[in-house]
From Swiss-Prot:
GO terms for biological process: rRNA base methylation. It is an enzyme of class 2 (transferase). It comes from Vibrio vulnificus (strain CMCP6). Gene3D superfamilies: Vaccinia Virus protein VP39 (3.40.50.150). HAMAP family: 23SrRNA_methyltr_F. The gene is rlmF. InterPro entries: METTL16/RlmF, rRNA_lsu_MeTfrase_F, SAM-dependent_MTases_sf. PANTHER family: RNA N6-ADENOSINE-METHYLTRANSFERASE METTL16, SAM-DEPENDENT METHYLTRANSFERASE. Belongs to the methyltransferase superfamily. METTL16/RlmF family. NCBIfam families: PRK11727.1. This is Ribosomal RNA large subunit methyltransferase F. Signal peptide: none annotated. Specifically methylates the adenine in position 1618 of 23S rRNA.
Length: 364
């Protein structure tokens, strides 16, 4: 009788000994397991955004008759303006703020950023939505204390939030002229009086330090950080945008009606303008975000939700990883798309859901 030999089991590859974890990897894995991360994409403008669809130029010119000379017809015969014309863009903003926010006295110094209002409004509405998710029932928006880092000469975020939600805002900036301009806007419009406080950040190396006092508490912070790493890079970006606008105008064959201003290379470009502090900082956006994240840890219990816009998508992941290492408990990435344009903000809190609920109960 032939003995049957049992087939030998295939040799298993030798298991490698696990690599000893460094302090960095231990910290990161521990913080990741405790961090509540959510990313959402929102298509179209928020339902509360007052700027759905095309601009109502009949309403806008009624609110600001001086806008009328800048209104043109596009190839479809629809009313528009030349978005390459800095004066036209500024007039459009003045009309929008007057017609929809009861801010009739708004102006900015020459050479300062003139922001697109619909997109700026969406940032505020999405943040309001974030706060509303913290409670059951109606959220007490009138009790919200907000902080805008880099309020600028235009004060656009406080204006929208105050007029739509009655938030109380503190606006900070490193530029004295921006603070003066924002203060004039606050003082000359009844709807803003008593709702907006301006603070000069006289330590340009800091973001929150020197602005958030020991007894200050904020439900949310907002920021549109400088994007470029140098003045030369900022100027190049501005010229590229202007070239693209000029090419689009030629392609579409847009014609201006009589009396409207024409584009001139010698005119100040306010819509793509901006001072140094508005456009660039050493190291660019990524460096600014890193400083903001590091400094936010110091005020972990004084701010419910920190937030900032992030222009460059590639900067989101490094910011998230850094926040996780700092021990942040909750991170939200909200992408906002309007047509082909996509913007995003990152919000973070050093408190978990239960702690945030207790924070709100304590401070309203």
């Amino acid at each position: 009788m032939t003995n049957k030999r049992k087939s030998a089991k295939p040799l298993e590859p030798a298991k490698r000994a696990p690599k000893p974890r460094t302090k960095k990897s231990r910290d990161l894995s521990a913080s990741e397991s405790n961090c509540d991360f959510v990313k959402v994409t929102r298509a179209g403008l928020h339902s509360r955004n007052k700027h759905q669809g095309r601009y109502d130029f009949a309403k806008l010119t009624q609110a600001l008759p001086s806008l009328a000379p800048f209104v043109i017809k596009n190839p479809k015969g629809e009313a528009s303006i030349s978005f390459s014309d800095s004066t036209a863009v500024k007039m459009l903003n003045k009309a929008l703020l007057s017609a929809y926010y009861q801010v009739a006295n708004w102006d900015i110094p020459a050479g300062y950023l003139c922001p697109p209002i619909p997109g700026r409004a969406d940032y505020i509405h999405r943040l309001a939505e974030l706060l509303e998710g913290e409670v059951k029932g109606k959220f007490p928006h009138e009790k919200v204390q907000a902080l805008d880092i880099g309020v600028g000469a235009n004060a656009i975020y406080p204006i929208i939030a105050i007029c739509d939600y009655r938030w109380r805002y503190t606006g900070s900036d490193v530029d004295p002229k921006s603070i003066e301009s924002a203060q004039r806007i606050a003082d000359s419009n009844p709807v803003l009086q008593g709702q907006l406080e301006l603070k000069l950040q006289d330590q340009s190396q800091h973001i929150f330090q020197g602005i958030i006092g020991p007894t200050d508490y904020f439900h949310v912070t907002t920021c549109n950080p400088p994007f470029h790493a140098s003045a030369q890079e900022a100027a190049f970006g501005t010229q590229r945008k202007l070239d693209n606008l000029a090419a689009n105008r030629l392609k579409k064959g847009v014609t201006a009606k009589a009396g409207s201003q024409k584009i001139s290379k010698n005119k100040p470009i306010l819509n793509f303008g901006g001072q140094n502090s508005e456009l660039w900082c050493q190291g660019g956006e990524s460096s600014f975000l890193k400083r903001m994240a590091n400094e936010s840890e110091r005020f972990a219990h004084q701010v419910l939700w920190f937030s900032t816009l992030v222009s460059k998508k590639d900067n989101v992941r490094p910011l998230r990883k850094q926040l996780e290492k700092l021990g942040v408990r909750s991170i939200r990435v909200v992408e906002m798309s309007q047509g082909q344009k996509v913007s995003r903000f990152v919000a973070w809190s050093f408190m978990d859901k239960q702690q945030r609920g207790e924070w709100i109960k304590l401070r309203g």
